[in-house]
Amino acid sequence: MEFVYSTRNPEVPTAYSRLDAMHTSCEILLPNLEEAVARTVTETVWNLVREADRRYNRFREDSVLSILNRTAADVAVEADEELFLILELCETFRKATGGYFDISAGSRIPDRTLVLDPRTHTVRFNRPGLWLDLGGFVKGFVLEKAVREVAGVTGCALLSFGSSSVAAIGAHPLGAPWPVSVAHPYYAGRAAHTFPLENAALSVSGKDPHGRGHIIDPVTGNTLEKEELIAVTGPSAMVAEVLSTALWAAPEGERGDILSAFDGYQAWELWCRTDGRTTVVKR
C-alpha cells in the first residue's frame, strides 16, 4: 500500500493512496484533510477492498465464492448475509437487463441454473459445470460502500478502482467537476474521452488498455469480441458497473431499452480507432 501526503499547495493539502487488489490498482485522492484523518479514511477504504478480495476472488481457494463454486452443484450451501444479498442483487439485475448481466458461467443455455432460497439463505446450482464470477459486480459494490464511508468524512474526494470504476464525491477542489479520462485501448497515455464527474460514478466496460476483451456472452459462454467501449455515468457505482457490463454484452439495438429502465444513468459508446481517433455515440 502506498500513501503520500502533499502540502506543496498549502491551500489544498492532498492525500493520495494506492492499493493493488481485486486484480487491479485501486486509488484514492483526498484533498483538504489533515494527514491523520486522511490516513484513517484511506485505511477504512482499503480494509473494505481487502475484505472483498478475500471473500469474492474466485481464484482464491479459501474465498467464500470459491467454496460456493466447488460445492453448490452437490449440496445447497448456506450463504452469509452479504453474499446472499449480492446474489439476490445480481439476480435482480439479470432480470432488469434482459439477461445481459449474468454472473453465472459454464452454462450455455439461457435457463436459470442458480437457485436462491431466501428462507434458508442457501444457494444451489441445479446443474454441474456452473460457476459464478463476481468480477463484473464486486468492484462497483465495494466502491459504493467506500463512497459512503468517505462521504461521511469529506465532501471532496475521488476514488478509482482500476480506472474502469470511478466515483467522484463533490466537485474538484478548484470548483469544476472532476475530469475523469478513459484510456484509449490502442494508444498508451492517450484519452479516448473525458467525463466531468460531480457526485457521480463512471464505469467502463470493453477492451482493456491492451486491446483485450474479457466479458462473457451470457447466452453462448464465449468471450465477446467487440470494438467499442461502453461508458456509463450515474449516481450509483454499483448500478453503473452493472449497466456498463450489460450494455456491452447486449446487441446495439437493445441497449436503449435496457438503459431506459434505469433513471438517472447515461451511456456512451466509445469507438476507438487504431489511428488514435475516437467516435463518441451517446445512447
What are the residue ranges of the model-derived segments?
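Mature catalytic core of soluble alpha/beta enzymes
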Residues: M1-R283
